[in-house]
Amino acid sequence: MENQPKLNSSKEIIAFLAERFPLCFVAEGEARPLKIGIFQDIVERIQDEECLSKTQLRSALRLYTSSWRYLYGVKEGAQRVDLDGNSCGELEAEHIEHALQQLTEAKARVQAQRAEQRAKKREAENVAAGEKNERPTAKKPAPRRRANNTEGEKRQPPRPQKRPQQARKPVAKPVQAKPIQAAPIQIVDVSSLKIGQEIKVRVGKSSVDASVLEVAKDGVRVQLPSGLAMIVRAEHLQF
């Protein structure tokens, strides 16, 4: 068997893992949650190959598990799998909550980057338009003066000058005060919640909308607008 060529990038390593372990890794589409300790399992399986180092493998796994398609797969009811596709247990609520937080923060970063790019583009367009308007226009040559009137010509009386019209002052529109949004209130007693009630789930420094599906002993089972259902502890709930 020919030696595997040296893999230079994380994307090449992920493609190699998807080809070698197709029941565990996927190159496209929603990924399945990996078994805890999958790194050591991979090292033992490919220890005779010199196509990649442990450092490269660790970086590739970090890229794979932080991708949006992997974070979408970390949801309630999903099972972790080993290299052969065997189930290794259901995901814990803490891991689901952490994945949701990472996904929310990643989307926020992308939106901020896009807004910054649009602002820079508008600024460049405004600068270009300003430079175009500031360019001096070519002056027309002054008309030649006519020769002195002959004795037989009559001088025409000067035309009366029109008064310049005063520019109308724009009427200032009243500024409407923005409504003050009330700060969210943390939920202390989950027994007061009702099925279908709209609440908020605190994720990091921000919060997302959710609706109550079930009030359990270890927390409240809620559903997010994306359809993801999860169990959340009371300290993460707000009105």
Curated annotation (Swiss-Prot):
Keyword Cytoplasm (UniProt): yes
Origin superkingdom: Bacteria
UniProt feature, compositional bias: Basic and acidic residues: 115-137
Stretches the record annotates as Disordered: 107-177
Classification via Pfam families: ProQ, ProQ_C
Entry's Gene Ontology cellular component terms: cytosol
Record's keyword annotation contains Chaperone: yes
Molecular functions (GO terms): RNA strand annealing activity; RNA strand-exchange activity
Subcellular location: Cytoplasm
InterPro entries xrefs: ProQ (IPR023529), ProQ/FinO (IPR016103), ProQ/FinO_sf (IPR036442), ProQ_C (IPR035236)
Any one biological process term the GO annotation gives: post-transcriptional regulation of gene expression
Function text: RNA chaperone with significant RNA binding, RNA strand exchange and RNA duplexing activities. May regulate ProP activity through an RNA-based, post-transcriptional mechanism.
Protein's UniProt name: RNA chaperone ProQ
Species whose genome carries this gene: Photorhabdus laumondii subsp. laumondii (strain DSM 15139 / CIP 105565 / TT01) (Photorhabdus luminescens subsp. laumondii)
